[in-house]
């Protein structure tokens, strides 16, 4: 993208790719996937958005974190962001998250998912998401934030899982992909107030193909 792209103007919300809601006669429950680097405020946005949608809130760290910590101890790793640990656990962690989402969707409940969604930013990864959430109309929300603000947020929240990132900010930032997803998505500036971000997502979902709170 060039510097003139509206997605890169402060305060801008940008929709990349075509909107593909379900046909009006077959409304689907929304499945909102909130992705972005650590520190962009994914969990904060999800916690504010889920009640507005009457949605189940599914967080990758909450759903799979305790088991990941056990595996880390068994394999002698203390850094949860260790690449070798990620290689062991990423596939089953995301499979668990998507399976929980699919169960809720089959029960008629919208879902809001929280995870970095790095592989899911690619056409191949997104195809896996849409296949597993076939009962839904998945929407990828990508939160972006300037590098210095990312580091400041991580230092402020001081979460155990961020210890490795905080100890070596330069190394952490080298792993952050600044490019937007290569699939249709809603790009949001994470520096904006949470209420404004929620409003942007709700506006994006205001299509006849989405069923929210039991209403088409």
List where the protein language model places each region.
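Hydrophobic anchor at the beta1->P-loop junction of P-loop NTPases
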Residues: 34
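P-loop (Walker A) phosphate-binding loop of NTP-binding proteins
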Residues: 37
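ATP-binding Walker
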Residues: 40
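Walker A/P-loop
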Residues: 43
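Conserved substrate/cofactor phosphate-moiety recognition/catalytic segment
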Residues: 47-102
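Glycine-rich phosphate-binding loop used to anchor ATP phosphates in small-molecule kinases
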Residues: 88-134
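Conserved phosphate-donor/acceptor-positioning beta-strand/loop module used by diverse small-molecule
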Residues: 133-154, 188
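Small-molecule kinase domains that catalyze NTP-dependent phosphoryl transfer to phosphate-bearing small molecules
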Residues: 156-200, 213-216
């Amino acid at each position: 993208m060039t510097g003139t792209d509206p997605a890169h103007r402060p305060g801008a919300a940008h929709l990349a790719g075509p909107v593909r809601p379900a046909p009006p006669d077959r409304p689907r429950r929304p499945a909102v996937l909130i992705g972005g680097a650590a520190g962009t405020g994914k969990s904060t946005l999800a916690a504010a958005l889920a009640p507005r949608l009457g949605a189940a809130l599914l967080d990758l760290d909450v759903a799979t974190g305790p088991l990941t910590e056990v595996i880390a101890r068994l394999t002698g790793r203390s850094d949860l962001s260790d690449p070798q640990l990620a290689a062991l656990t990423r596939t089953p962690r995301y499979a668990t998250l998507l399976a929980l989402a699919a169960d809720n969707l089959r029960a008629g409940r919208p879902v809001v998912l929280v995870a970095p969604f790095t592989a899911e930013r690619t056409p191949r990864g997104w195809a896996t998401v849409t296949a597993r959430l076939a009962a839904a109309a998945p929407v990828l929300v990508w939160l972006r934030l300037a590098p210095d603000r990312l580091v400041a947020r991580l230092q402020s929240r001081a979460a155990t899982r961020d210890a490795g990132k905080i100890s070596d900010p330069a190394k952490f930032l080298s792993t952050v992909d600044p490019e937007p997803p290569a699939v249709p998505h809603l790009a949001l500036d994470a520096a904006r107030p949470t209420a404004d971000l929620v409003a942007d997502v709700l506006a994006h979902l205001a299509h006849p193909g989405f069923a929210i709170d039991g209403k088409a």
